[in-house]
Amino acid sequence: MKNYTLLNISIGLDVSKESISVYIPINNLDYEIKNTLDGFNKLISKLKKLYKKEYDNLVFVYEPTGSYSELLKKFCSKKSIKTFALNPKRSHNFAKASGSRNKSDMDDAKVLSGAIVLAKSEEISIPVISAVAEDIKELMSYYKFIVKQRVMASNHLESITVKDGNNYVISSLEDEIKTLKKRENDIVVNIKKIIDSDEDLSAGYENIKSIVGIGELGAIVLLHLFLKYPDANKKQIISLVGLDPTRFDSGSSVHKKSKISKAGAKIYRGVLFMGAMMATRYNPEMKLFFDRLKANGKQTTQAQIAVMRKMITIAHSLYKKKQKYSSDVYQKACGML
């Protein structure tokens, strides 16, 4: 029997909407499958023939690509296949360091296979899928879709109304906006029912909501974020919301003011911005933090964004540590205790 190394059992998978490029190191084999259950089953059959008794030791390495990689994750969970879900930034840096020019998807799959060397032991595991958490994710995805539709309809209504446009169009848009708002509320009610039906989710939700300034929707949005990215650290969570600073430097003389990246979904920032405004009025610690930033010369928006970051990192800590908010918790989070 062959003595397989970690690199030999690392299967690289470059995921796209309709297909997945696969690199199988044992025979330096490039392989393409459909991004379907049938495609995965064909791959498994091939891998079992190639690896025989070593099949159970295989590790699938891939970059999470939103909804496109969800089926792969669920399949691996069901079939007890170990995976290493590689952060795209780490993957890019590894490819650059290894001299890859990313000429094709097959090259990308090979790079992903080699990236197994980056994995810590705790990062290689069989995915755990929570049916309840998946329901919340799907409902939140639908909620974001409905909100986007409502915003588009509202903007269109404004453009028609300002020029005293067609009454039928105005009336239809007003009805559509009312319907979409009702649907948003219905989705929130459904999500809350799911949360209330699960003891752990309910506790996590209440711990997040214990921060003065974070309301029902804010707690749902953050709970969804923490469920979606269970292994993210505080810095990564801030980036996923799109509140990480982006600096602009050109040469030695041009330095623009840093801005937030806005890389995450707008709904997170929109909901949490309202929460930050409430917190600066009714949360003593957040108000003090905000006032101190203002006194030090920060603009109002900059100070509000800083409050948002602070609220998110504290909420993340409360969720992870299963604690409720208090002045002591805030001071510990700020290194004051």
Kindly give the residue locations of the regions a language model identified.
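Gly/Thr-rich phosphate-binding beta-strand-loop-beta motif of the actin/hexokinase/Hsp70
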Residues: K2-P25, L112
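Nucleic-acid-processing active sites and adjacent nucleic-acid-binding tracks
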Residues: N27-V59
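Acidic, metal-coordinating catalytic cores used for nucleic-acid/nucleotide bond scission
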Residues: V61-L71
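Long, charge-rich intrinsically disordered scaffolds of nucleic-acid metabolism proteins
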Residues: F84-N207
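Short, solvent-exposed helix-loop connector elements
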Residues: I124-E138, T161, G165, K256-K259, ...
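Phosphate-backbone recognition surface of nucleic-acid-processing proteins
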Residues: S210, E216, L222-N296, T300, ...
